[in-house]
């Protein structure tokens, strides 16, 4: 059997040694950065209440620049009620050189101020349309990047093969 490992990191403790280990041993790596600087720093302050974006971003760039081409990564952001303009976060990732991107909705109790609510859904749908236009414009300019939600098979969904065949163990 061929076993492949995935790791998710917020990047804070990444150093050259860990980057080398990840690039040698992990088939897939998920780089967790909530979005552009103000979005990430609002959700992920450091212990001294300073933002973490500027600490993490150079480490993530180094990881992907040194990553073997036969191994994968995604930079993964999160959109919340506080950044319903999440297409800006996707564009931030693309403009920073990340070719494989994903931005997922936050999951949380509605009592959290950042939680998505039913009344936010029209804005979320509108923002996906905005993102589609921006994505198409970048592709026309020759700037190729992938956005996970636009890569999903709309007829089968991302997990249909696994549901039909089992986990394979």
Locate each region found by the language model:
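Conserved SAM/AdoMet-binding glycine-rich loop
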Residues: 1-37
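Radical SAM enzyme [4Fe-4S]-AdoMet core and its adjacent flexible, acidic
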Residues: 38, 42-61, 65, 69-162, ...
């Amino acid at each position: 059997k061929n076993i492949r490992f995935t790791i998710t990191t917020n990047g804070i403790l990444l150093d050259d040694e860990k980057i080398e280990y990840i690039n040698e041993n992990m088939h897939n790596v998920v780089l967790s950065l909530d979005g552009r600087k103000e979005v990430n720093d609002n959700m992920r302050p450091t212990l001294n209440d300073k933002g973490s974006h500027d600490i993490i971003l150079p480490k993530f760039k180094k990881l992907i620049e040194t990553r073997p081409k036969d191994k994968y990564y995604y930079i993964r952001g999160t959109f919340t009620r506080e950044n319903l303009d999440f297409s800006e976060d996707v564009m931030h990732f693309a403009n920073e050189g990340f070719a494989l991107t994903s931005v997922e909705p936050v999951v949380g109790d509605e009592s959290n101020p950042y939680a998505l609510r039913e009344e936010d859904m029209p804005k979320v749908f509108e923002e996906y349309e905005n993102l589609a236009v921006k994505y198409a414009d970048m592709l026309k300019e020759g700037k190729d990047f992938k956005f996970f939600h636009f890569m999903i098979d709309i007829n089968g969904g991302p997990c249909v093969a696994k549901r039909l065949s089992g986990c394979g163990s």
